[in-house]
Structures are given as structure tokens and as C-alpha cells.
Amino acid sequence: MVEKIPMTASGYKKLEDELSTLKVKRIDVIEEMRLAAMDKDMRENAPYHAAKEQRGQIEGRIKEIEHELKYADVSEYTDTNTSKVNMGSTVKLRDPKNGECCTYTLVSPKEIEPLKGKISASSPIGKAVFNRNKGEQIEIEVPSGTLQYIIEDISF
């Protein structure tokens, strides 16, 4: 049995868009191969071999995306579920010592974008806030010690 792949709705849509783009690109690469194959000497036909390699990479990524979409467990949460932090939640944390705040959105491991504040729900911060309520104090174990935060806000 294949495990479900946790994913947000936006992550699912992003994969669908990438799949559509790759299918169009595959057609273009096949045409490049056909044109390059018109040069009868296949042993030293660099454009043909480059296009063939590119097609293999595209085919591999298409299969990977199709697998992810087939087994995706898309998390859909609405504003009525904002009492607890879940997949897709945006959570604002406040450090009780200095009052500094930081904001993170919990996503699947395949959707992480640290520079945009998108972190994995299975990361140390993600695990610490998951299924917690607004106002709760959390502790996060890091190599340098323990960090404490208060959940200031939860949104979707």
C-alpha cells in the first residue's frame, strides 16, 4: 500500500500547472528530436542526443508529478478551523522574552520555501505548533537549546 502524500491545495495546484507545462514542453522536445534526426549521422548528432536527454528528464518528472498527484492527501481547511494549527495554516509566533514575532505557513515537505516562510509541518517548528491553539506557549528543541514562543495568531 502506498502512503498518502500530505499536500496543501495550493501545492496540488502548483503541481498540476507544472505537469501541464511539462506535457507541452515534451511535445516541443519530441519535435526537436525529429528535426535533429534528419541529420543521418546519429553517432555525432549532439542536438539529437541533447534533446533525447532532455526528454528523459521531462518524462521522469512527469511520472514523479503524476505519482504525487495520484496519492496526494490534500488538506482543505476553512476559516471555521482556525482554532487549531493545521497543514496550510499561517501561524504568528511571539517570543515572550523580547516580543519579536515571526510568521510561518505549514506545508508539506515538497512545498517548503524557507525564504517565503513556508516550512514543513514535520520540521521542529511545524511539529511544535501542529494541532495547537492560539495563545498556547510552545517549546522548540534546537541544537543551541530550547526556544519558547506563544502562538499569537492562526489564519488560512
Swiss-Prot record:
GO terms for biological process: DNA-templated transcription elongation; regulation of DNA-templated transcription elongation. One of its GO terms (molecular function) is RNA polymerase binding. The keyword Ribonucleoprotein does not apply. Keywords: Coiled coil, DNA-binding, Transcription, Transcription regulation. Residues 12-72 form a coiled coil. Gene3D superfamilies: Transcription elongation factor, GreA/GreB, C-terminal domain, Transcription elongation factor, GreA/GreB, N-terminal domain. It comes from the Bacteria. Signal peptide: none annotated. Necessary for efficient RNA polymerase transcription elongation past template-encoded arresting sites. The arresting sites in DNA have the property of trapping a certain fraction of elongating RNA polymerases that pass through, resulting in locked ternary complexes. Cleavage of the nascent transcript by cleavage factors such as GreA or GreB allows the resumption of elongation from the new 3'terminus. GreA releases sequences of 2 to 3 nucleotides. Belongs to the GreA/GreB family. This is Transcription elongation factor GreA. It comes from Dehalococcoides mccartyi (strain ATCC BAA-2266 / KCTC 15142 / 195). The lineage of its organism: Bacteria, Bacillati, Chloroflexota, Dehalococcoidia, Dehalococcoidales.
